[in-house]
Amino acid sequence: MRVLVQAEPFEFGAEAQTFADGAAGAGAIVTFTGLVRDLSGALEAMEIEHYPGMTERAIAAIAEEARQRWHLIDALVIHRHGRLGPSEPIMMVATAAAHRAEAFAAAEFLMDYLKSRAPFWKKEVTAGGADWVAAKEADEAALGRW
C-alpha cells in the first residue's frame, strides 16, 4: 500500500501500470484520476495546502481501513499539493482485489474520503482574486453512505 502526497506531477498511466505489475493475484484493478476542474472558465490555478505528516497519516489510516474492509490486495493513493492549473491531475486512487465489487467499492470509499475529509485546504485563484473552497453537501452525503 502506498500513500504519496507530493507537489510533483505524476503520470497516471505509468502509475497504473506499476500498480498492476505489483498486484499479483488480483482479479480486478480499479483506477481513478481526478483533475482540476474549471467550471466557471475563469480558474487560473488551484492552490492546495496540507499539514505534512498529518495528511499522510490520515490517508494511510483510511487506506488501511479500506484494505481490511474490502480485503484489498493493494491500494495506492496519490494526492498533489501546491499550485495546479486547470485539467492537471490532482489525485489518483487505485485498488486491487480478488473481485471487481470490492475493488470498485474500496476505490469509491477512498475517493469520497479524499474529497470530503482528507486534511487538504483548496483555494481557487482567478483574475479577480482567490477564494477558499468550501465543503459541498453532496460530498458529505457521498461519504455518509459508507
Swiss-Prot record:
Pathway(s) it belongs to: Cofactor biosynthesis; molybdopterin biosynthesis
Residues given in the record as substrate binding sites: L35, V36, R37, H99, R100, K115, K122, K123, E124
Catalysed reactions, as listed in the record: 2 [molybdopterin-synthase sulfur-carrier protein]-C-terminal-Gly-aminoethanethioate + cyclic pyranopterin phosphate + H2O = molybdopterin + 2 [molybdopterin-synthase sulfur-carrier protein]-C-terminal Gly-Gly + 2 H(+)
Top enzyme class: transferase
Disulfide bond keyword on record: no
InterPro entries: MoaE_sf (IPR036563), Mopterin_biosynth_MoaE (IPR003448)
Signal peptide: none
S-S bridge residues: none
GO terms, biological process: Mo-molybdopterin cofactor biosynthetic process
Keyword annotations of the record: Molybdenum cofactor biosynthesis, Transferase
Coiled coil feature spans: none
GO molecular function, one term: molybdopterin synthase activity
Pfam short name (any one): MoaE
EC numbers: 2.8.1.12
Subunit structure: Heterotetramer of 2 MoaD subunits and 2 MoaE subunits. Also stable as homodimer. The enzyme changes between these two forms during catalysis.
Function: Converts molybdopterin precursor Z into molybdopterin. This requires the incorporation of two sulfur atoms into precursor Z to generate a dithiolene group. The sulfur is provided by MoaD.
Similarity field: Belongs to the MoaE family.
Name of the protein in its database record: Molybdopterin synthase catalytic subunit
Organism (species): Cereibacter sphaeroides (strain ATCC 17023 / DSM 158 / JCM 6121 / CCUG 31486 / LMG 2827 / NBRC 12203 / NCIMB 8253 / ATH 2.4.1.)
